[in-house]
């Protein structure tokens, strides 16, 4: 046979063993496997779900005057009213299926 070059640049007079025409390739799996059972559905409750989310607004105070004014404001306002101003509630009702 003619001399052939290998990857390293060395000339060989015979082809590599892995290049033989009658070499058998190992069979690979076709990707099919036993089917998995479908996940069981969870039972839904009869009542609806209410989600309440509360968060506090981010209030930035930049000067001491604002702090003094804020304290005066706090003294004039009922604490329950202030809580209503500073907190917001979000209610979501999810109907039962």
Curated annotation (Swiss-Prot):
Signal peptide extent: none
Motif Nuclear localization signal: where in chain: 37-45
Cited InterPro entries: SPAN-X_fam (IPR010007)
Tissue expression as described in the entry: Detected in testis, melanoma and bladder carcinoma.
Protein family according to the UniProt entry: Belongs to the SPAN-X family.
Nucleus found in the keyword field: yes
Species annotation: Homo sapiens (Human)
Chain residue ranges for the region called Disordered: 1-47
Compartment(s): Cytoplasm; Nucleus
UniProtKB keywords: Cytoplasm, Nucleus
Protein's UniProt name: Sperm protein associated with the nucleus on the X chromosome C
Gene Ontology CC: cytoplasm; nucleus
Entry-linked Pfam families: SPAN-X (PF07458)
């Amino acid at each position: 046979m003619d001399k052939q070059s290998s990857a390293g640049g060395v000339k060989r007079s015979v082809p590599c063993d892995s290049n033989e025409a009658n070499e058998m390739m190992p069979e690979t799996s076709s990707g099919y496997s036993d089917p998995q059972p479908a996940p069981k559905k969870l039972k839904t409750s009869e009542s609806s779900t209410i989600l309440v989310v509360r968060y506090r607004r981010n209030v930035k105070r930049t000067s001491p005057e604002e702090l003094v004014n804020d304290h005066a404001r706090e003294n004039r306002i009922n604490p329950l009213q202030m809580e209503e101003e500073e907190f917001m509630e979000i209610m979501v009702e999810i109907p039962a299926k």
